[in-house]
Every structure is written in structure tokens, then in C-alpha cells.
């Protein structure tokens, strides 16, 4: 029986020895290819001539040494034609050495080999350098359809090709929510507010709560610039789609947001804004709903702990209704509501009566907008009156509403 095994052993030993030899050879080749000297990496290529990765390492070492690397890259491409990164490098090499035709062919080969962002980004840059808009825009659009991370370089390249915001938006920007969000951020950063308007509208139509901060920031920029209708259109889109937890606004009717304090103040757009003030703390009571403030007496002598922008009609009369109660605050409290033109700061009404009542109390404030007023600012003001100390105690608010009067 033992003799019968001898022929099998005679066959197995050479095969095992051959396999062991190649394992050691390939391992040694891999070790050499990771050296810092191009000559050592080249020795690794001789030991594993069919390994594309080692050819790429050789090209890297030769480039680092300032030597020619294209032969190693061409060999790597022949061994691994599906490696898009190699084709991109060959394309850039060809372009740098005055062969645009070969450069384009290599970059197109890279795009066919990979459905990822990098080959299309390389193609878009190539066509931008060639001043070829007909080929640039499709490649920029393709790149953005699969892009991730920081997209500002793509947007900057688009604006270097054209200063026409409508053309850029139509040809380059895909209807991807994440891309629209990033492009809106880019336009705000560049202060291109007019170009941002259709982008904000497109984003608002598909927005999720994740996009809310970006769109509210856009609304704030519009309000700062006096573009109330543009801000209101985006705001109402978000409200109608329940991205914002509010009812839509109407300058001819419901122009106040969340008068019952059903949601936490968002601090932007047409929502309530709580000012971070030393000596003042604030919070929302969910049931029953009201907003409360506590004044320590160490707050600034004049401050506005709460405010909201109101989209109003020019030359119209309004009535603000509200309920409040106070604790440990005297009659001359220094607390009142103030309504002003958001652009000029001019007062639109006499201030409300001083807020002071230990029990819940209903009150109202009438005001009239100026002929050019389309945005008002409602603010809760707190100031130290002459001869008095600063306010110290508590204030609660609920049931605010705003109606347009005949």
C-alpha cells in the first residue's frame, strides 16, 4: 500500500514546489514594488510582469523622480484595461505632450471603464481647457449626477465656462436634491442671489427636512435684500409640503407664523427668532402651549428677546391680538410689543401697553403699514425705564394672531 503512494508523491512534490516558488516570487515582487526607488520597483516588475498594480507603482516612482512614466502606464492599461484611473493619467499625459486627440480618446476610455465621478470630472476639465462648451456641458452634468463631497470645484468650473446662470442651471445642474442643495449653498457663498432663485424653487419642490436650514438661509438673504415675494414663495412651498410645521402665509390675511407656539422657534425666515441674551432665559411649554421668558435683572438695559418678520401689504391696517401673563413684574414693566418697518426701522404703531398681569390677559395692538412697506418686524422689547431697575421676573405668551382690518 505504501509503494502505491510513491507515484502520487512523485507527482505532487514538483507541483507543490512550483506553487511555492511562485508564491515566494510574487511576494518578493510585491515587496520590491513598494520600495522608494524606481530601480527597485523595476526589479519587482521583472518578477511579476503580468501584475498591473506593480506597473502603476513603477509609474508613480518614476513620476516622483521626474522620469518618464508613460511606458509603465501603457503596460498597466494593457494588463488591466478596466482601470479608469490609468486611462485618465494617460489622457493627461497625452494632453500635456501636445496630443489632444489621444488625450480625448484615453479620457473617453476611462469614462467607459468606470461609471464613477472622476473620469467625467477629468473629461469636463479637458473640454473646459479646450474651450469646447458643446462637449463640456454634458460631461459636467454627468459628473454632478454621480458626484459626492465638495462640489464647489465643479460649480466654479461651470461659471468659468459661462456667466449665464440660466444656461448653467439648464445644462449642468441635474435635478438631484443633494446637488441642488450644494449649488444653492455655492450661489449664496458667491452672493449670486438672482441666480439662486430658480435653484431654491427647484430644491423647495423636492426638499426634505435635511434641506430646511439651507432654504431658510436663502429666505433670510432675500429678506435682507428686500425680496419679500421671493422669500414668501419658497417659505409657503415648504409649508404646503410640510417641510416646515407651519401654515402658509398671506400678506392680505394670515401674516403671522405659529402664534400658538406649536413648534420650536426656527430662528430664521418668517419664524419666531429667539435672541441669545445674557440674563434672559426662554422656553416653550408644549401643553398647554405658551412661550415663557425669565428675566434675571442682569439683561441689557434695552433688548429684544423675541422677534418675527411679517409679510404685509403696503398701506394696510392690521390688528395684533395676544395673551400674556407675568410674575413678579410691576405695572411699569418696560415690556411691550413694537412693530416697525423691517427696511427702515420706522415705527408703524405706538407700542403696546406695558405687559403686566399676574393672570392671563388678552390685549391687542393696531398698526398701519406705510405706502412702501411690504415687510414688518414684530418684536418683544424689554428696556429699563428711567428711575427704575431692570426687569426681573417672568413673562408668558400665547394665542397670538394677526388680521388685516378693512
Where are these regions (language model features)?
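Extracellular and organelle-lumenal recognition/adhesion modules and their flexible linkers in secreted
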Residues: 4-30, 149, 171-406
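Short coil turns that delineate tetratricopeptide repeat
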Residues: 46-50, 81, 114-115, 145-149, ...
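TPR alpha-solenoid repeat register
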Residues: 54, 86, 119-120, 150-154, ...
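Canonical positions in the second alpha-helix
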Residues: 43-44, 75-76, 109-110, 143, ...
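Structural motif corresponding to the intra-repeat A-B loop/turn of tetratricopeptide repeats
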Residues: 63-65, 97, 130, 190, ...
Amino acid at each position: 500500500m505504501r509503494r502505491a503512494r510513491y507515484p502520487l508523491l512523485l507527482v505532487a512534490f514538483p507541483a507543490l514546489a512550483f506553487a511555492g516558488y511562485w508564491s515566494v516570487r510574487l511576494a518578493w515582487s510585491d515587496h520590491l514594488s513598494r520600495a522608494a526607488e524606481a530601480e527597485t520597483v523595476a526589479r519587482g516588475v521583472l518578477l511579476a510582469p503580468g501584475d498591473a498594480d506593480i506597473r502603476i507603482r513603477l509609474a508613480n516612482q518614476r513620476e516622483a523622480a521626474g522620469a518618464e512614466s508613460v511606458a509603465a502606464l501603457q503596460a498597466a492599461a494593457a494588463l488591466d484595461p478596466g482601470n479608469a484611473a490609468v486611462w485618465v493619467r494617460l489622457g493627461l499625459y497625452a494632453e500635456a505632450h501636445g496630443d489632444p486627440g489621444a488625450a480625448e480618446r484615453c479620457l473617453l476610455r476611462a469614462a467607459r471603464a468606470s461609471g464613477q465621478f472622476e473620469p467625467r470630472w477629468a473629461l469636463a476639465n479637458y473640454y473646459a481647457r479646450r474651450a469646447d462648451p458643446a462637449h463640456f456641458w454634458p460631461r459636467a452634468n454627468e459628473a454632478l449626477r454621480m458626484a459626492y463631497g465638495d462640489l464647489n470645484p465643479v460649480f466654479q468650473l461651470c461659471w468659468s465656462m459661462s456667466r449665464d446662470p440660466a444656461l448653467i442651471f439648464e445644462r449642468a445642474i441635474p435635478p438631484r436634491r443633494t446637488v441642488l442643495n450644494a449649488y444653492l449653498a455655492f450661489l449664496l457663498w458667491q452672493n449670486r442671489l438672482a441666480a439662486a432663485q430658480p435653484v431654491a424653487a427647484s430644491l423647495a419642490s423636492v426638499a426634505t427636512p435635511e434641506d430646511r436650514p439651507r432654504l431658510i438661509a436663502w429666505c433670510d438673504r432675500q429678506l435682507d435684500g428686500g425680496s419679500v415675494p421671493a422669500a414668501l414663495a419658497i417659505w409657503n412651498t415648504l409649508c404646503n409640503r410640510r417641510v416646515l410645521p407651519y401654515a402658509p402665509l398671506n400678506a392680505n390675511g394670515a401674516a403671522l407664523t405659529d402664534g400658538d407656539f406649536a413648534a420650536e422657534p426656527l430662528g430664521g425666515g418668517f419664524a419666531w427668532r429667539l435672541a441669545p441674551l445674557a440674563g434672559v432665559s426662554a422656553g416653550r411649554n408644549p401643553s398647554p402651549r405658551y412661550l415663557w421668558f425669565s428675566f434675571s435683572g442682569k439683561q441689557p438695559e434695552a433688548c429684544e428677546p423675541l422677534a418675527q418678520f411679517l409679510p404685509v401689504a403696503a398701506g394696510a391696517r392690521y390688528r395684533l391680538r395676544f395673551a400674556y401673563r407675568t410674575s413678579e413684574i410691576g405695572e411699569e414693566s418696560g415690556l411691550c410689543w413694537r412693530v416697525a418697518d423691517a427696511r427702515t426701522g420706522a415705527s408703524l404703531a405706538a407700542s403696546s401697553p406695558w405687559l403686566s398681569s399676574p393672570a392671563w390677559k388678552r390685549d391687542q395692538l393696531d398698526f398701519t403699514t406705510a405706502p412702501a412697506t411690504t415687510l414688518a418686524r414684530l418684536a418683544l422689547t424689554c428696556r429699563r425705564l428711567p428711575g427704575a431697575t431692570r426687569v426681573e421676573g417672568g413673562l408668558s405668551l400665547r394665542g397670538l394672531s394677526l388680521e388685516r382690518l378693512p
